[in-house]
Amino acid sequence: MVTEPDAAADLGDNDGFLAEHAAAIHSATSRIAGHVRRTPTLPADEIATGVAVKPEMLQPTGSFKVRGAFNAALSLLGRSPDARGVITVSSGNHGQAVALAARNLGLDCTVVMPEGSNPVKVAAVRALGARVVSEGVTGANREERARELQERTGLAMIHPFDAWDTIHGQGTIGLELLDDLADLGTVVCPVGGGGLLSGCAIAVKAARPDVRVIGVEPELAADAAASMRSGRHERLAAPPATIADGLRSLSIGDRGFEVIVRRRLVDQLVTVTEDEIEQAMLAVWTRLHLVVEPSGAVGVAALMAGRIPPSPAGSRIAVVLSGGNVDPALSARLLAAHAARLATGGSAP
């Protein structure tokens, strides 16, 4: 499904907003330099002609989340040099990123993760020295539990998506795409809580309002598309059962809603099926030789399904591959099915 705003974005109303937040994203680039990797932008004609990918699985914790985590933690220390620790909620990737930032900056760290979270990601958070709180935690109550712990411990909250410091850090990806691709025509980002999409939209639209920004989410977690259709901040009734565990937020954040829906800085939101996500993962693994997780593959899934409109002639489509922390059991299942299909004369994705 493809969803567009009711009316074309009026960027004239957004000039001050864009200038303020684009400046903060530029500051974040300088702040996090030396703490995160400046990932390359790679041609991906093996996926489709005129496509490039941003492989954020090459970051130290395997996802883009280190950008927002380090920007938030460093900004915290700039404001409160005596801060002793941080707390966050996460399904995995953000938790790893905050744990790494906390360890490297000498801060205590607690990560509230729902029961049943990806065991690879839970183990990785613990390996980085963070305390994991999961007992009785669900996707629906995790933020409430984190706020309770924050009040008891005095730790500073680093929100995974609904905080400007986090959004500004994620927006550094947009600046890098602009630097790398003079012929950039379209940016495609996953959307869960909306931090990555919002940050990239601000960075791109502030410099190049002609570049289209498209968000992609699973059909089973299509709250952002519902919000764009209705103009209201829609929320899912229960945690979605999508394979894309990093995109299981019940809703986009308040700040994401402002950027994506109210200010119309995102041109389209599209959705993809679970099978399309799996086929996209296999395509990235086998064609680009990059390990991408389900959440990171949704942009390629939309592209392969024909839901991303062609860019204007001569311009590129840049797809953000947001992470590569895959559950080994899922990898084994997909690769076994792929091998069986090839063995019986089936085609590769």
Task: Cite the ranges covered by each PLM segment.
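PLP-dependent amino-acid enzyme catalytic core
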Residues: M1-P349
